[in-house]
Amino acid sequence: EFQMDTKKLREAIAADKEKGLIPFVVIGTAGTTNTGSIDPLETIAGICRENQMWFHIDGAYGASVLLSPKYRHLLKGTELADSISWDAHKWLFQTYGCAMVLVKDIRHLYHSFHVNPEYLKDVEGDLEHVNTWDIGMELTRPARGLKLWLTLQVLGTELIGSAIEHGFQLAVWAQEALQELDNWEIVSKAQLAMLNFRYTADGLTE
């Protein structure tokens, strides 16, 4: 439900090639922030391989499910991505903004962002000893990752995974409670920790 249609994806890629365009990237979603839907990541990865395209996963919300032993199977195919975006300020319980991009090959970031002005030569890095400005757009930046590191040190991934699993259960409980009531409609069923519902009493329009 609410997933990418991979048949239409194949058709769109073929149509672009027919026009002489060069499709180069597909972005799959690992848990939308409105319905919790997860795209068929393994299938999308296969399509990307067939067409020599970059496969990025928007895991801003749902990538945190990887910390849940019970539910991480829902993100099967994540390991096939070339890059993943992941917001710790969504489901890793951090304050805004704390997010990350994970890449399979750091050289892609380094060769895209590495700069070598004269005033930085005294702290020049390389692929073995990376300076963060060599793998992103910012030079001076706040220590956004420190709060996540501290949280992981204090709570650990097991406790965070349990909290994520509790979020799944809360969504299911809410859905079951609403289904027992009159005039309430489930718009999208409980997925991850998301549930959409509305009040549908007679005489009321949308």
How should each PLM-predicted stretch be described?
Residues 60, 106, 151-155, 191, ...:
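Histidine- and/or cysteine-centered catalytic micro-motif in compact active-site loops
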Residues 18-19, 128-129, 201-206:
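Short, glycine- and charge-enriched coil/turn segments that flank and shape catalytic ligand pockets
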Residues 178-187:
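Surface-exposed helix-capping loop/turn segments at secondary-structure junctions
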Residues 24, 32, 51, 76-179:
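Active-site C-terminal subdomain of aminotransferase-like
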Residues 1-110:
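Conserved PLP-enzyme active-site core in the AAT-like
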Residues 1, 124-125, 189-190:
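Short, ordered beta-strand-loop transition motifs
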Residues 186-206:
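Conserved PLP-binding catalytic core of the aspartate aminotransferase-like
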